[in-house]
Amino acid sequence: VNVLGGIEYSINNATLCSVGFSVRVFNYAEGAVRGLTQGNACMGRGDSGGSWFTLFERQYGL
């Protein structure tokens, strides 16, 4: 899945929001992602985006 700037996309009830970048997601159900950075994720406290990014942080030790 590619998410381009200004577009929100829902994947398994998690909303991704990119800001001028392309976000490519692989194997979301297992938490594997590529190309996501803090700058292009919606990470509001308590929302699905925040949970999604936390999963990313745990996978890659950020």
Swiss-Prot record:
Optimum temperature is 70 degrees Celsius. Keywords: Antibiotic, Antimicrobial, Disulfide bond, Hydrolase, Protease, Secreted, Serine protease. It is an enzyme of class 3 (hydrolase). Inhibited by phenylmethanesulfonyl fluoride (PMSF) and p-chloromercuribenzoate (PCMB). GO terms for molecular function: serine-type peptidase activity. GO terms for biological process: defense response to bacterium; proteolysis. It is found in: Secreted. It comes from the Bacteria. Optimum pH is 8.0. Active from pH 7.0 to 11.0. The active site is at S48. InterPro entries: Peptidase_S1_PA, Peptidase_S1_PA_chymotrypsin. Its EC number is 3.4.21.12. The keyword Secreted applies. One of its GO terms (cellular component) is extracellular region. It catalyses: Preferential cleavage: Ala-|-Xaa, Val-|-Xaa in bacterial cell walls, elastin and other proteins. Monomer. Belongs to the peptidase S1 family. Has bacteriolytic activity. This is Alpha-lytic protease L1. It comes from Lysobacter sp. (strain XL1).
